[in-house]
Design a protein with these regions (language model features):
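An N-terminal boundary/leader segment
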Residues: 1-97, 106, 320, 336-346, ...
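Gly/Ser-rich catalytic/binding loops embedded in alpha/beta enzyme cores
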Residues: 32-225, 243, 267-270, 441, ...
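Acyltransferase
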Residues: 67-68, 149, 301, 328-353, ...
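Structural helix-boundary/capping segments
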Residues: 76, 161, 212-320, 324, ...
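Short helix-loop capping/hinge segments that flank enzyme active sites or metal/cofactor-binding pockets
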Residues: 116-135, 304-319, 368-443, 495-503
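Flexible glycine/proline-enriched surface loops and loop-helix/loop-strand junctions
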Residues: 134-137, 191, 203, 253-261, ...
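Short, surface-exposed loop/helix-turn segments at secondary-structure junctions
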Residues: 452, 464-482
Length: 570
């Protein structure tokens, strides 16, 4: 079964016109509940982690009160009201953990900037507590894992409160050719917080929604190709996709050890940087060989690189070929971003194309690597779980067939079946892995940076949110995540503007372990633009025939039910 990139794009289509039938509430049947003031003299909504810490240091706020405030918002906005459906579980131990952290603070023992800060984790990140880890699938419903994922353990050690687990695209969007971003058999369909009939992207859907809707101070997602940065773009927040190996993947339901990485979602670059420092593995993790090298390039404090004037004197390249031209509206946000970057004192080189982008967009190497690694990596992970219904990919396939009314009611499991069939030899895999590393890294992003002595590349992260449509699938035109994904390089999405009331983000791309430079640039862009707009949970976004998109060749077509091609985000 040969699949080229264009087919890969087409097969990545899914979403939700039939949300009620998916087991979630119908669109906004009553007004959004009024948020009662939980903290006298302080507005929790949009508060930064630094502001929350200052309030706790001054005695105006406690970890217990902050946790209760977010729990109240979850009940009002996620379970009721707009029913965002972004959270699968709230940690029953969150309150007691918060009380313990408040006692530490009163004793003068503050662990750091995350002390007492509630954080949500994507449901594919193991926690050894009273919460399950299921990757959104009923096939993993059962006892909690025996051990925390390393990122969860690191966050706990930093003083963060694991508030709960977020809904996600089931199995991180690597089950079906036709899955809907933000849908899982366990949780149903997530909703975009800006317009509830729009898709939140995925696979870290709930993490993006919850941070945008102020249900948490920040959240943690995972990415193989686009799953942190796409929900960040579409949900109007910051997302950092770190270099592979900066954060440990131990205890995370895998797709690909060559591309998987764990990173933060937050409303500001500063908050995302704070979370990244708490998550990062400064020492090698024996459970993840990718953390063995480059520890001198990993920091416990990434906020030191924040700089509101970070664009001044920088050289920024605009990657256009293969990652722009999908819609007038998205391109308009890009042009505005370029203008802001220039006004902030940067030199812009336009275009600064990735020379290997055509081969990257064909996707043959990436597909080979992901399909080959998925079966092996997933089976190895499942061997660590006990008391759940499945122990292998083959058993997951059989489970879904036995529970097709709940798991296969909207789409199938073609990626599962394809991976289980072992279509690629070890030689095929080794060749593809070496080639994707080359075209993504040295001959791709690195070559583009070196050609014009650039500090970073920018590109639109993706187009605005499409209508959720479980029957026909995701409708997005394209994205810029793949070069960094296959190289294992970092990307930061920052809100850049709005199109039809929907957020559009810009990605800053750099070389391996280039997070310090990207954080400096991203914080400068954020300070120059202040583009984030708080969501208002509007029921639907009606569009008329004036909305148009451009195909790759520049011709224009009228947009009806959505773009004909969709780049999968996994």
């Amino acid at each position: 079964m040969d699949i080229d990139r264009r087919e890969f794009l087409r097969l990545g289509a899914t979403a939700t016109a039939a949300t009620a039938a998916a087991g979630i509430a119908p669109p906004l049947l009553r007004a959004v509940p009024e948020m009662r003031p939980e903290v006298p003299g302080m507005e929790i909504e949009e508060a930064t982690i630094a502001e929350l810490q200052a309030a706790m240091a001054a005695g105006r706020l406690s970890a217990v009160r902050l946790t209760r405030t977010y729990e109240h918002r979850i009940e009002a906005l996620d379970r009721n009201g707009p029913s965002l459906n972004s959270i699968l579980q709230v940690n029953p131990d969150a309150g007691s953990i918060a009380r313990g952290l408040d006692r530490e603070r009163r004793a003068g023992q503050v662990r750091g900037p995350l002390h007492g800060i509630p954080v949500l984790l994507k449901d594919n990140i193991d926690t050894a507590d009273q919460m399950m880890t299921t990757a959104g699938s009923l096939a993993l419903v059962g006892p909690a894992p025996a051990q925390d994922a390393t990122v969860a353990a690191n966050l706990r050690a930093a003083g963060a409160i694991i508030l709960g687990k977020t809904n996600m695209s089931e199995w991180a969007n690597f089950r079906s050719f036709h899955s809907s971003s933000g849908w899982s058999g366990r949780g149903g369909q997530c909703r975009n917080p800006y317009y509830l009939d729009r898709n939140p992207c995925g696979s870290s859907s709930g993490s993006g929604i919850a941070s945008s809707a102020n249900l948490t101070a920040g959240s943690v997602g995972t990415e193989t190709d686009g799953s942190i940065v796409c929900p960040a773009s579409i949900c109007g927040i910051v997302g950092i996709k770190p270099t592979v190996g900066l954060t440990s993947r131990a205890g995370v339901v895998p797709i690909s050890h060559s591309q998987d990485t764990i990173g933060p979602h937050a409303r500001t670059v500063a908050d995302a940087a704070t979370l990244l420092g708490g998550m990062a593995s400064k020492d090698p993790d024996p459970r993840d060989p990718a953390t063995n090298d480059n520890r001198d390039k990993v920091y416990s404090d990434y906020t030191q690189f924040l700089d509101p004037t970070g664009l001044s004197g920088a050289r920024i390249g605009v990657a256009r070929k293969g990652v722009t031209g999908y819609s007038e509206e998205t391109d308009g946000v890009l042009e505005s971003a370029i203008h802001s970057i220039q006004n902030a004192g940067a030199t812009v080189v336009d275009p600064a194309d990735i020379p290997t982008i055509d081969q990257i967009n064909q996707g043959a190497e990436e597909i080979t690597v992901l399909v080959y690694e998925f079966k092996r990596d997933l089976n190895a992970y499942l061997a660590s779980r006990s008391g759940v219904p499945i122990a292998t990919l083959a058993e997951a396939i059989a489970f879904n067939l036995d529970h097709k009314d709940s798991e296969l009611k909207w789409f199938g499991q073609e990626w599962f079946e394809f991976a289980e069939s072992d279509p690629y030899s070890e030689a095929d895999y080794n060749t593809a892995l070496a080639e994707e590393r080359r075209i993504g890294g040295p001959d791709g992003i690195d070559a583009a940076l070196a050609k014009d002595n650039l500090d970073a590349l920018i590109a639109p992260t993706g187009s605005p949110a499409w209508p959720t449509d479980l029957v026909n699938g995701d409708h997005f035109t394209g994205a810029s995540s793949s070069p960094a994904a296959i190289a294992g390089y970092p990307v930061i999405n920052v809100p850049a503007g709005m199109a039809f009331g929907l957020p559009v983000g810009i990605s800053f791309m750099g070389t391996a372990f280039g997070e310090p430079k990207l954080i400096k640039l991203a914080s400068g862009f954020e300070a120059a633009t202040k583009a984030r707009v708080k969501p208002k949970f509007v029921p639907s976004l009606p569009l008329d025939g004036s909305v148009r998109r451009r195909d790759r060749d520049g011709d224009e077509d009228r947009l009806s039910s959505g773009p004909s091609l969709a780049l999968r985000h996994i």
